[in-house]
Amino acid sequence: MQRRDFIKLAGGATLIPIAPSVFGGQISHSKWNSYRLTYQINLPTKGKRALLWLPLPDTTDTYYQFTQGSVWNGNAKKAKFHNIPKTNFPVFHAEWRGSGPRKVTVSSIVKTRNRSVDLQNFFEKKNRIIPSSIKRFLLPTRHAPLNGIVRMTASSITKAANANTPLEKAHAIYNWVVDNAHRDQTARGCGRGDIKYMLERNNLGGKSADLNTLFVGLARASGIPARNQYGIRI
């Protein structure tokens, strides 16, 4: 991995800003770009039943992205747009019964624009309050527990860097991941994201889910709200 400029990336990757208004005067905007994303699905014809779950563009409106809706057509017996339970992640779900052709086309219109956040002059307020909607990004997960070796590693990283504020700690963790982790082409799929397993075996090689979760887990263990956020190149 190559070291990148954390100051340019911190506002747009996995850290969750506590108060977006704090960054209002530091966010640079550019023109909007429109895209139509079309997925054409043709499933195997054999079998009595077929199910499809298709991830869709994030429907949460932000200052850099929003969706104008999705439509579908095809021969599915049942189909619907909905969010994965307990999340804001939208998916398209379709069902076919009986053998035969199973086709569906799903289109989404998305508007995006480039963004950057200049943190050089960022001033962090004391006694910050974390909104309830953000607190879930401080919770442990099955593959990213926040105790044991994960917490010990996070603590050693921030202490070695003499990092005290959340921004300083995030910067230190980011640099540590860049310096110590690497992409492993032999990992299956996008990786498992099991950072406890990675740290216990001192093997920090992996793919996107592994490396992203490593940063997110260490950040959460340091009291910094963070989440995994994946996207599609357009």
Segments from the language model and where they lie:
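Acidic low-complexity segments
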Residues: 82-84, 103-184, 188-202
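C-terminal segment of N-terminal export signals and the immediately downstream linker at the start
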Residues: 20-42, 47
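Hydrophobic/aromatic-rich core segments of domains that either
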Residues: 211-234
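Surface-exposed beta-strand/loop patches in extracellular or lumenal glycoproteins
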Residues: 44-60
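N-terminal export signals
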Residues: 5-24
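Solvent-exposed beta-strand/loop surfaces of large extracellular or lumenal domains
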Residues: 61-94
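Short, hydrophobic/aromatic-enriched beta-strand segments in well-ordered soluble domains
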Residues: 37-41, 52-54, 102-114
